[in-house]
Amino acid sequence: MTFQKLGQDNVALYLDYLKLAMQQEPYMMTADFFDEDGIRKRIADPFFQNTTSILALEDDGVVGRIEYHFYVCMQDGCKMAYVDWVYVLPEHRHKGVAQNLFREFETACNAFGIDHYYLIRSERPEADRFYRAFSDAELSNEPLLRKSLSV
């Protein structure tokens, strides 16, 4: 398994992955369709450069993705990250893809001195088991996960 940041050079593989994900699990997607030209434009648009998508690739295809943003609080300088999307194709689940995507993400967080990250958890039982396996993470009754990276 290799990891690549989403960019112009691998957008075709990413679009194939999105098509497959929408065919296999349309109820898991946040939209009923996606705009291929719009995605290509957003990758090139400086406004979207604060968004990072890391792709997990196997056999020359995308099998999973994590998307996140870094941000900072001006008042106290606390550096944070927000994970807004994690998805692994069904046939690649339970093989360490999501764990490795989070490992890549946490490596990027550490490189930028990120103090902690947040995500809104899926309430699906399978996803909940995955998030409960995180070490040093806080899970509230709300579907929010917070993990401190500066132990």
Segments from the language model and where they lie:
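A conserved beta-turn-beta hairpin within the catalytic core of GNAT-like acetyltransferases
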Residues: Y71-V83, R93, A137-N141
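A short beta-loop-alpha structural element at the N-terminal edge
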Residues: M1-D16
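Conserved acetyl-CoA-binding loop-helix of GNAT-fold acetyltransferases
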Residues: V88, H94-T107, A133
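Terminal substrate-recognition subdomain of acyl/acetyltransferases
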Residues: A133-V151
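Conserved GNAT acetyl-CoA-binding A-motif
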Residues: F102, C109-S122
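Conserved beta-strand in the GNAT
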Residues: S53-L55, G61-F70, Y82, Y87
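Conserved GNAT-fold acetyl-CoA-binding loop/helix
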Residues: M22-R42
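Conserved beta-strand-loop-alpha-helix junction that forms the acyl-donor binding cleft
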Residues: Y117-D128, R146
